């Protein structure tokens, strides 16, 4: 085999490999069971924040720490598991469900992607997340010659991701066969 970069080895076949992995996860009972087991072991029925802060950095005495931690954990729980799902920009999942979905994507595709959003809500918290299918991260034709962009990820000179090109719709979506990219 030819010695080449990991991107060169993987990116050309990424879509086919991911499609096969998703098909396997949907149609193979053993894989489906392993996926469910992974989600259950990592998250369980509900994600629970177990905060252990450094009290001196917060300017708190050790005696004050327990009350502060309890307050933070209760607020997190109210935000994360709100029945109206304000943690999800689409308002369809709780935080635990989003984490379980991310574990599933990571298990099948080796990656998961969430966009942090700011959206006013009745819950009192405006931070929410938008789940994005990893295959929607893609390089548009208009910038395909830009060497700082690979597979829709724009990187700085050190390789740190500084931006993403996201298809507004999945390329195989039923609603349309055309899609736009958003940076």
List PLM regions with ranges.
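N-terminal-proximal low-complexity accessory segments that begin disordered
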Residues: 1-65
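Structured, mid-chain assembly/scaffold modules that mediate subunit interfaces
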Residues: 36-183
């Amino acid at each position: 085999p030819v010695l080449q970069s990991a991107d060169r080895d993987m990116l050309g076949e990424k879509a086919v490999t991911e499609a096969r992995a998703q098909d396997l996860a949907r149609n193979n009972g053993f894989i489906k069971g392993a996926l469910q087991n992974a989600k259950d072991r990592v998250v369980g029925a509900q994600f629970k924040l177990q905060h252990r802060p450094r009290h001196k950095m917060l300017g708190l005495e050790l005696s004050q720490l327990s009350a502060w931690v309890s307050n933070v954990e209760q607020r997190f729980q109210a935000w994360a598991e709100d029945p109206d799902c304000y943690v999800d920009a689409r308002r369809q999942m709780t935080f635990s469900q989003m984490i379980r979905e991310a574990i599933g994507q990571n298990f099948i595709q080796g990656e998961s992607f969430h966009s942090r959003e700011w959206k006013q809500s009745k819950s009192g918290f405006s931070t929410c997340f938008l789940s994005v299918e990893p295959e929607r991260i893609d390089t548009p034709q208009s910038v395909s010659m830009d060497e700082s962009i690979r597979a829709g990820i724009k990187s700085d000179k050190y390789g740190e991701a500084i931006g993403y090109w996201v298809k507004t719709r999945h390329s195989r979506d039923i609603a349309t066969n055309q899609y736009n990219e958003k940076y």
